[in-house]
C-alpha cells in the first residue's frame, strides 16, 4: 500500500529534476540571412573554397567552452553549438568572406572545379571568457587548387572586448566569437582584394 505513493513520489521528483532546469539552446556562428548572399555567380569569377577549419581537438565539439584562468574550461549549462565548432567557424568565415569578396564565388562546400583557390585555416586558440572577452589566434594559407604552393600566407590575433558584465549570457559569448571571425574575414579579405 505504501509502495504506490512512494513510486509516484519518485516519478514526480525525477520529472522535476529533468524538466526543472533551464532549456539548452543551440547556437551557430553564422548569421541568418534574409536574402541571397551578394557574391559572384558568374562562371568567369574566381572561386574560393573555404576548407574545414583545423583547431585543437578539445575545442572541436558542440560545447560552448568558457575559459576560467590559464588551464580551466567550463561548458555552458544553457547553450551548445548546433554543429561542431570546426564546421561553425568554416560556415561563418565563408559567409563573411562572400560578403567581403563580391568578385569571388566563395563556398565551404567541396568543389570539383580544378581552378580557383582554396583557403586553409588553422585555429591555434579560440578563447571566450566569462565577461565576454574573446581572443582568436589563427593562421591561414590561400593556395591554388591546381598546386600546393601558397599564394598568400597570413596570421593574426583577433579580439573582441568584454561585454561589460561579470558573467556574459550565452548570446553575448556567441556574438563575441562571431565578431572575432568577422575580424579574421576582414584580414583575409584585404589580402585577397589586393591579390585579385
Model regions and ranges:
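Short secondary-structure boundary motifs at beta->alpha junctions and helix caps
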Residues: 72-80, 147-184, 190
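Soluble periplasmic/extracytoplasmic beta-strand elements of cell-envelope proteins
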Residues: 47-52, 65, 118-123, 135-141, ...
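Juxtamembrane/interfacial segments around transmembrane helices
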Residues: 55, 142, 172-175
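A structural "domain/chain start" motif
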Residues: 17-83, 115, 194-196
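Sec-dependent bacterial lipoprotein signal peptides
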Residues: 1-18
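Surface-exposed short loop/turn segments
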Residues: 19-37, 100-149, 163, 167
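Extracytoplasmic/secreted envelope proteins and their assembly/folding machinery
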Residues: 86, 90, 94, 98, ...
Amino acid at each position: 500500500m505504501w509502495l504506490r505513493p512512494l513510486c509516484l513520489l519518485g516519478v514526480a521528483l525525477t520529472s522535476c529534476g529533468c524538466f526543472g532546469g533551464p532549456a539548452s539552446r543551440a547556437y551557430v556562428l553564422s548569421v541568418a540571412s534574409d536574402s541571397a548572399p551578394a557574391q559572384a555567380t558568374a562562371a568567369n569569377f574566381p572561386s574560393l573554397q573555404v576548407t574545414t577549419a583545423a583547431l585543437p581537438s578539445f575545442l572541436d565539439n558542440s560545447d560552448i567552452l568558457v575559459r576560467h584562468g590559464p588551464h580551466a574550461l567550463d561548458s555552458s549549462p544553457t547553450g551548445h553549438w548546433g554543429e561542431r565548432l570546426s564546421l561553425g567557424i568554416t560556415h561563418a568565415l565563408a559567409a563573411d568572406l562572400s560578403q567581403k569578396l563580391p568578385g569571388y564565388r566563395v563556398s565551404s562546400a567541396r568543389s570539383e572545379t580544378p581552378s580557383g583557390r582554396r583557403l586553409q585555416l588553422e585555429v591555434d586558440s579560440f578563447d571566450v571568457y566569462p565577461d565576454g572577452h574573446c581572443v582568436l589566434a589563427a593562421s591561414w594559407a590561400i593556395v591554388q587548387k591546381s598546386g600546393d604552393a601558397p599564394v598568400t600566407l597570413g596570421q593574426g590575433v583577433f579580439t573582441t572586448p568584454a561585454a561589460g558584465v561579470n558573467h556574459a549570457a550565452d548570446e553575448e559569448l556567441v556574438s563575441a566569437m562571431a565578431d572575432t571571425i568577422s575580424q579574421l574575414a576582414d584580414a583575409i579579405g584585404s589580402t585577397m582584394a589586393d591579390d585579385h
